[in-house]
């Protein structure tokens, strides 16, 4: 009887430790020291859309339109990759990237809102997706480790980035050589929660990014613009970056 009681206590301790470990692993945190501060970059002379929701539309509609499948195919995502879901929100991309990159890969789900990441943590635990790490960022700085990403995806969030030049500048060191930055957005004015492609190209070029390809996505999913980040050694000085006038 005593042995059975002791075994039960030991099992409870193991469960408590495992639960604590999972909670700590899911706790949103900055994954890198601060990069260059927002004040050294030119303020964008254009609107910045408010962050109004962690979701764009229902996930069923996005799946029916084939959004994720099209993006994954174009980017040639595969097992073993480390992919950043920047502005992860409710985790539409994160939960689909997780099985795609597999146990040998990693998804870093980053957002500036701790509350969104807390909700995503609960979703990940329910779905038992162990290869997703949560990362807290700032509006001008994603705060991600150097050379950690094979690809980074910003899905329907670029128009909400308050300091695009600082954000892109501080993101570049996190991308491995040859890594892709994929931006998905609607071809609409910023105020209507989209980014005109010409404006997007101008802002990324101002920080040294090179456009690789441009694709119109199925249904109303918008467009996918793929860029290659500049080498850190060739990044322009923040004081020389010129704002793209709208």
Model-assigned labels for residue ranges:
Residues 84, 88-142:
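Class I SAM-dependent methyltransferase SAM/SAH-binding core
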Residues 82, 106, 178-181:
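Short glycine-centered segments of the SAM/dcSAM-binding site in methyltransferase folds
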Residues 150-164:
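A short SAM/SAH-binding and catalytic strip from SAM-dependent methyltransferases
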Residues 216-246:
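Core SAM-dependent methyltransferase catalytic element
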Residues 26-84:
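Class I SAM-dependent transferase core
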Residues 180-203:
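Conserved class I S-adenosyl-L-methionine
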Residues 140-152:
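A short acidic, Gly/Pro-enriched loop at the edge of an enzyme's catalytic core
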Residues 98-99, 165-180:
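A short glycine-rich, Lys/Arg-flanked "PGG" loop and its adjoining helix->strand segment in the class I
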């Amino acid at each position: 009887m005593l042995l059975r009681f002791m075994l039960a206590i030991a099992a409870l301790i193991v469960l408590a430790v495992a639960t604590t470990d999972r909670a700590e692993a899911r706790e949103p945190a900055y994954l890198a020291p601060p990069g260059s501060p927002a004040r050294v970059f030119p303020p964008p002379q254009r609107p910045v859309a408010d962050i109004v929701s962690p979701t764009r539309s229902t996930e069923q509609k996005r799946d029916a339109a084939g959004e994720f499948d099209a993006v994954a195919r174009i980017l040639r995502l595969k097992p073993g990759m480390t992919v950043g879901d920047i502005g992860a929100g409710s985790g539409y991309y994160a939960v689909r990237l997780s099985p795609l990159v597999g146990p040998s890969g990693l998804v870093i789900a980053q957002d500036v809102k701790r509350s969104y990441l807390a909700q995503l943590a609960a979703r990940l635990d329910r779905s038992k997706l162990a290869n997703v790490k949560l990362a807290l960022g700032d509006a001008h700085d994603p705060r991600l480790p150097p050379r950690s990403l094979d690809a980074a995806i910003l899905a329907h969030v670029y128009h909400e980035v308050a300091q695009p030049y600082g954000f892109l500048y501080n993101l570049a060191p996190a991308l491995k050589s040859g890594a892709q930055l994929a931006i998905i957005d609607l071809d609409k004015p910023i105020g209507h929660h989209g980014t005109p492609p010409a404006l997007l190209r101008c802002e990324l070029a101002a920080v040294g990014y090179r456009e690789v390809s441009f694709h119109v996505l199925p249904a109303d999913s918008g467009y996918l613009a793929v860029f290659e980040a500049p080498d850190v050694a060739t990044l322009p000085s923040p004081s020389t970056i010129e704002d793209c006038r709208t």
